[in-house]
């Protein structure tokens, strides 16, 4: 890949869920481009405590504290990436899901972004510039029956992102969404290992079964966190200055429809 080692020089970025997986891929790419990056995570690895803020973004108080700390440390935020998210496996199907199950999915996958945007956007409006990316999921287009609240929340996040882009474009702020498919993060790899142990098959065979379970991946392999990081870096850079309100699917071709 072409390197753009100084394209984000002088810019600051905040990334939620940025210590592992896709979030780390995004953070690493923005740092490589010269950005000053803070990441938010539930816990702070000792070795990275200088650029990590411990935050529970599933609560209003947690998001408020994160926004205040990030602005205090960075002064202003030019790039905001909402990567945090999560899905749980429901037992008993949709009818067994409680209001608490739904609220938890909405708090983590939708309201975390809404609340943090509310804290950070005013500064962007004052400066007349900024770039936001909301990380959604192909489940918003191809939902699985085992994670219905998650899929619904990500669909809502996509629509929120589009509406927000329409509001903020005249103010010089761009908003886009990135929709990843199966990306082999640390947790995804562990899942493949566990499947392999349970079924007495290799990790490669387990990975193939996972890909088949989502309808296959035409490119033949899972994505990498760095792949998503490269896409996000493009979208928040000046190279994408005329792009806003878009959703970019990065799934190796998993979603067959347009």
Language-model region placement:
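Short, small/polar-rich loop/turn modules that mediate ligand/substrate recognition or access, typified
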Residues: 169, 174, 243-245
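Substrate-binding pocket helix/loop in short-chain dehydrogenase/reductase
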Residues: 91-94, 98-106, 132, 213
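Active-site loop immediately N-terminal to the catalytic Tyr-X3-Lys motif
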Residues: 142-148, 170-171, 220, 238
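C-terminal helical subdomain
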Residues: 177, 201-239, 243, 252
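Conserved glycine-rich cofactor-binding loop
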Residues: 12, 19-20
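Short C-terminal tail/terminal secondary-structure segment
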Residues: 2-5, 91, 142, 221, ...
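Active-site helix of classical SDR
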Residues: 117, 153, 161
């Amino acid at each position: 890949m072409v390197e753009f080692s100084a394209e984000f020089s002088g810019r600051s970025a905040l990334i939620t869920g940025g210590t592992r997986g896709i979030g780390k891929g995004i953070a690493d790419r923005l740092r490589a481009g010269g950005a000053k990056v803070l990441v938010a995570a539930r816990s702070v690895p000792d070795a990275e405590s200088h650029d990590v803020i411990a935050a529970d973004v599933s609560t209003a108080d947690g998001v408020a504290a994160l926004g205040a700390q990030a602005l205090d440390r960075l002064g202003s935020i030019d790039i905001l990436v909402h990567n945090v998210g999560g899905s749980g496996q429901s037992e008993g199907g949709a009818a067994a899901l409680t209001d608490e199950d739904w609220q938890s999915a909405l708090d983590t996958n939708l309201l975390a972004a809404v609340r943090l945007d509310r804290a950070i956007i005013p500064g962007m409006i004052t400066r007349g510039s900024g770039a936001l990316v909301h990380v959604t999921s192909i489940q918003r287009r191809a939902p699985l029956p085992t994670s219905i609240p998650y899929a619904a929340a990500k669909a809502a996040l996509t629509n929120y992102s589009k509406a927000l882009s329409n509001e903020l474009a005249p103010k010089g702020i761009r908003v886009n969404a990135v929709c990843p498919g199966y990306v082999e993060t640390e947790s995804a790899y562990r899942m493949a290992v566990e499947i392999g142990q349970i079924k007495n098959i290799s990790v490669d065979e387990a990975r193939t079964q996972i890909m088949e379970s989502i309808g296959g991946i035409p490119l033949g392999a899972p994505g990498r966190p760095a792949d998503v990081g490269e896409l996000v870096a493009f979208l928040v850079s000046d190279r994408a200055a005329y792009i806003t309100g878009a959703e970019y699917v990065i799934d190796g071709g998993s979603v067959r429809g347009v």
